[in-house]
Amino acid sequence: MKKKRILAMILAVASCLSLAVSASAANTVARKATDFRDFDKSAWYAEAVSAAVDNGLLYGKSSTIIDPNGDMTRAEMAAIINRSFGCYKAADISQYKDVSKSKWYYNDVALAVQMGTYNGRSSSAMAPDSPITRQEAMTVVARALELDYDSYSKTDLSAFSDRS
């Protein structure tokens, strides 16, 4: 039951990938979605984002901004997955030259790599600040849930501009 609840929450958040509902701002956490000045409680995403904030999956860009019209980055998705699954063991990610120890997401990327949900875009680049595509996001979720995604039917994604 808990796995289904986690899956539902992650899928709701992932469905909002056109939003930046940021996972960053490690030092400031809104208590509820309506604490963000740019949160529209009548928007189509309101229920899912409210649940994600209430459950500690989304923190926002700051204590007052969630940026619902921006892109979600690969680092932000890593943070959401780590918070969803309670990852605590980090990998050595020193080979990724674009992941600085001074960035808020350094530990989240290391946790996601150790969990097996993330790979670099190359042997030396993780691209944590790049927008995450739907395909990448769903691959991360499938890996986190240890799904055998090769056994599922393939769907034509040509209608989506962010397909990869």
Predicted ranges, named:
Residues K2-A46, D54, Y59-N107, Q114-Q135, ...:
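Feature responds to low-complexity, polar/acidic, surface-exposed segments characteristic
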